[in-house]
Amino acid sequence: MGPDSALIVQARDLRRRGLSDQAEAVLRAAVRQRPDHLEAHRDLVQLVWTRTGDAAASMAELDAAVRASPDALGLRAAQARLLGAVGRSDLAHAAYESLCATPAGADPRFRMEASRAAVAHDPVAAVAHARQAATALPGDLRATCVLAEALLAAGRADEGAPIIEAVLAKVPDDQGVLALAATAWRLTGDPRYRDLYDYDAFVGGGLIAVPSGWSDLSAYLVDLVAALDRLHTRETDPIGQSVRLGTQTRHDLLRDPDPAIQAFFRAVDTPIRAYLDALGQGDDPVRRRRRSGYRIAGAWSVNLRPGGFHIDHVHPEGWLSSACHIEAPVGDDDRAGWLKFGQPGLPTKPRLEAERFQRPQPGRLVLFPSYMWHGTAPFTTGPRRLTIAFDLVPGA
């Protein structure tokens, strides 16, 4: 292991132990020693962002390295990617456009990134980048999906729909592709949209059970809140996740030994099985995968502060997804902080709005298909929202 890699390992170990100041100092030393060290820059941006939520501060060392070496295309590409990750999609788009005029632009996979950076700012450019990538990579499903996304953003859903339908025929259970197809069908008025977004059939759930060892649900939730609070140690949202103005736990809660957290996965069994029983049989993407059992595939907690929200997203690795509010106000009537469904997490022309809202209720588990666009409406005042979420996959 070289000295540069040793510094990164040291910084990651310090961060795992909660010594963020020391970890940041080590990473700053690493990028100043090797300004072209992309991994060290990425770790530093991630660390500063999660501590401050300040895009300029997070990018400062990398921006300085790019100014010092403007011909270092690897540094410039990393800068473009990370600008998007810290919420500066405008600067990311500009950086990608500049890079597309260099040899980096000859890489079709880089063109895909440039297309996704452009969709919210210049859909025409997004289509051009995506079409170039798809032409260079015939048969590449990801390139085809990027082209379809760009067409939806450009108001050309009639062209995008058959493109994504061809992909869906090859990967009929891909949750991201299902979400994209549903978006195209909604834009074109295709009745198949309602087969996928049947909210009455597919959005359900119920109160979790009172786990053994607790007298009632309120007492259990108090202990669960305390257990989760010990895990929410970062100051702001993680890079690459859907959380804004909040924190998300780093590790899989399934592996957390805390008794209150482990009890949660027993407590959700009752509403999960009731939901599966109510689904019934069918040949749609949800029911056709239904088995007698299920498996939880990853679980995490989110703590949203006032002003926080989830951007609209789907869960590509799931079959069914969930949200269970552990702590939330129960009296709001203005939908602030409510779970919402149906608003795509990608630009479309015309813009599509949410169609279904779910009021938070502590202890209530909400289940829905993993391909269904969902997020939370922003809230500016009042208490925080603390949730646990997980994905389900079919089990024996």
Whereabouts are the PLM-identified features?
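Structural motif corresponding to the intra-repeat A-B loop/turn of tetratricopeptide repeats
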Residues: 17, 51-52, 86, 120-121, ...
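Residue-level recognition of tetratricopeptide repeat
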Residues: 3, 37, 72, 106-107, ...
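Residue at a conserved register position within TPR or TPR-like alpha-solenoid repeats
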Residues: 14, 48-49, 83, 117-118, ...
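Non-heme Fe(II)/2-oxoglutarate
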Residues: 195-289, 309
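Catalytic core of non-heme Fe(II) oxygenases with the double-stranded beta-helix
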Residues: 259-269, 273-367, 372, 377-378, ...
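Structural register within alpha-helical repeat arrays
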Residues: 10, 44, 79, 113-114, ...
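TPR alpha-solenoid repeat register
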Residues: 6, 40, 75, 108-110, ...
